[in-house]
Amino acid sequence: MSVDQQDDAPLRERIQENPGPALKWFAGALLLFSFEAGAVINFLTGLVGAPVDLPTLLTRDLIANNGYQTPGGAWKETFLNLAPAYAWAIRVVLVYAYAFIWMLWLWRGYLVFREHYRYADWTPRDDMVDRLRGHRWGQFGAVIVFGFIVLALFAPALGPTTVERTISNPYSHHIEYYNDQGQLENITVGSANLGSRSQGTPDRNVGPMQYDDFGRFHPFGTLPTGKDMFTFMAAGARVSLFIGLISIGVSGLIAVAFALLTAYYKGLVDLAVVIVGDSIMSLPRLLFVMLLSVVLGETWIADIYSGGFVLALIFAGTGWPFLWRSVRGPAMQVSEQEWIDAAKSFGQRPRVTMQKHMAPYILGYLLVYASMTLGGIIVAVAGLSFLGLGINPPTPEWGRAVNIGQSYVTTSSWHISFIPGVMIVLVVTAFNALGDGIRDAIDPQSEGGESDGAEVAASGGGA
């Protein structure tokens, strides 16, 4: 295949010419996926309310931390008869190690693509990646975002117990423990929760990294209802991530479509979108979201993911003008470039021109503002839950934990509000830091002054 033919060949044909490296990488990825396929499938099916129970390598069934302590001090029915805290810590370390290996393997896949299947020895994306790898603030954000995503994706494995056992149906599950008389008793999880409540006094509090009277380990302590707080926070991370990704995905598609249309056609098309977008942006967003949450709260759509889906659609419908405004400028810059005029003069269809020659150069900017917007959505969802709106109880949500723990801030149960509050601040800061890193990688002159429009457009994701 000649160089010119190779330049125009799709990736599929390039892989067919040299399938060896791609097959080796895919085999490794398939092996990694097989270890935790059940966790991923459970996450995807859980989004539509039909979770399945499939075996995985790092589940609590294999590395169990739910057991009981004998009068002699030994633990039974835990992994290797270890204390629940150690068994839980081993499982957490292995899950995060597994996720980190996945990240390394994805990076390896990118290097394989660069070495064997990319027709150019260098592209502007290479410099972007190098700048991002040296951006300490962006790296900080990436590490925290990575931890947040892993917490959400593997929430059932990371929690010391499950949402089903401690939150949804605690009276349908039982645990065993030795009472003060040294007798083995069987009690429902709900009854054990009542005896493990954190309510602000030393004798009614289970704080971070403590055991309750029934031998259960609580990394973040318990809630005023006695439910495990780490499990609550992990499940809440999954809810926040679901809402954020759906919202950003929908609003991002709308923003890109309108940005390309307004940049290509300009004139009345641009004016119409400006009027619609400005009208939506002029509304008090939080009040508008609260109004829609109440209005749509009694509809069938509010039952999907405990109200999370309707929240995602509301944030998408009210947030796309902000993303569109962010990428409209770069789209206008790209539309003035010579290659766009050349495509028009050769009679190329507008859809092909926008998709092939314009869209790649604004996706980098969309990624920057989307990462920052995602942090804002997490705060907004937490705020709505704090006010009693949004996610329907008893589905876990971080803002609800802040709300129910605010009366215990100055007591021994300070952890109930403090931990979710810190996590909200940390995750939102991390998304903003990651966005800053991506922005500086795309446009290295963004902090030092104005950069040339063509250079900025070319670095925004072109091949």
Give a label for each model feature.
Residues M290-L296, V334, T373-I419, M423, ...:
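Glycine-rich helix-loop "coupling/hinge" segments at transmembrane-helix boundaries
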Residues L283, V289-L292, F309-L323, Q333, ...:
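Hydrophobic transmembrane alpha-helices
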Residues G297-G307, T318, G364, S371-M372, ...:
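C-terminal transmembrane helix and the adjacent membrane-cytosol boundary/short C-terminal tail
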Residues E36-V52, R60-I90, W137-G138, A152, ...:
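Generic hydrophobic transmembrane alpha-helix motif, especially the helices
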Residues P19, L23, A27-L30, L241-I254, ...:
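Transmembrane alpha-helices
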Residues L132, M233, A237, L241, ...:
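Hydrophobic alpha-helical elements at and bordering transmembrane segments
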Residues M1-F140, L153-T225, E450-A463:
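Membrane-topology segments of multi-pass transport proteins
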